[in-house]
Amino acid sequence: MILRAVVQRVSRARVTVGGEVVGQIGPGYVVLLGVSREDDEAAADYLAEKVAGLRVFEDEEGKMNRSIQEAGGAVLAVSQFTLYGDVRRGRRPGFDRAARPEQAEPLYRRFVERLRALGLHVETGRFQTHMEVELVNDGPVTILIDSEKTF
């Protein structure tokens, strides 16, 4: 169970497919989510709760002390199997540890639904589709999270 997420605090972001905007947010997070072959629903729930609870928005004193909910932000969640690219051998990444689409999509959807159940507005990309993700990093603040608690 090693779900991976790259969480980027943004002032705005959008994802397009074939020139059509399919997801768009103002201030909040872009979450790039990678699902491994070992992942399960518990991993998706854990990661969603961790993302929702992160305190990386400034309070009145300028300290990172507020969650996305307290800041009134939204999430743009994008599935990204390339987070499991392994380049330890050679120069071309191998994706053996990435979940197959039929396993990854339900866990990606579970992650999104859990964020929504926690009260967040969530926009998404399109699963297993070539997308263009545009974002404006705020800070920049970028956090790596995995369900195995490696970082």
From Swiss-Prot:
RNA-binding: present as a keyword of the record? yes
| One GO term of the biological process aspect | D-amino acid catabolic process
Q: Which UniProt keywords apply?
A: Cytoplasm, Hydrolase, RNA-binding, tRNA-binding
Q: Does the keyword Hydrolase apply?
A: yes
Q: Which reaction does it catalyse?
A: glycyl-tRNA(Ala) + H2O = tRNA(Ala) + glycine + H(+); a D-aminoacyl-tRNA + H2O = a tRNA + a D-alpha-amino acid + H(+)
Question: What Enzyme Commission number(s) appear in the record?
Answer: 3.1.1.96
Tree of life domain:
Bacteria
Which ranges belong to the motif Gly-cisPro motif, important for rejection of L-amino acids? 139-140
Q: Main site of residence?
A: cytoplasm
Per its record, what are the GO molecular function terms?
A: D-tyrosyl-tRNA(Tyr) deacylase activity; Gly-tRNA(Ala) deacylase activity; Ser(Gly)-tRNA(Ala) hydrolase activity; tRNA binding
Instruction: Give compartment(s).
Output: Cytoplasm
Can you quote a single GO CC term? cytoplasm
> What HAMAP family does the database record attribute to this sequence?
Deacylase_Dtd
Assembly description: Homodimer.
Task: Quote the record's domain comment.
Answer: A Gly-cisPro motif from one monomer fits into the active site of the other monomer to allow specific chiral rejection of L-amino acids.
Q: What does this protein do?
A: An aminoacyl-tRNA editing enzyme that deacylates mischarged D-aminoacyl-tRNAs. Also deacylates mischarged glycyl-tRNA(Ala), protecting cells against glycine mischarging by AlaRS. Acts via tRNA-based rather than protein-based catalysis; rejects L-amino acids rather than detecting D-amino acids in the active site. By recycling D-aminoacyl-tRNA to D-amino acids and free tRNA molecules, this enzyme counteracts the toxicity associated with the formation of D-aminoacyl-tRNA entities in vivo and helps enforce protein L-homochirality.
Per the record, the similarity remark reads: Belongs to the DTD family.
Tell me what this protein is called.
Answer: D-aminoacyl-tRNA deacylase
Species source reads: Symbiobacterium thermophilum (strain DSM 24528 / JCM 14929 / IAM 14863 / T)
What taxonomic classification does the UniProt entry list for its organism? Answer: Bacteria, Bacillati, Bacillota, Clostridia, Eubacteriales
As recorded in Swiss-Prot or TrEMBL, the protein's gene is named dtd
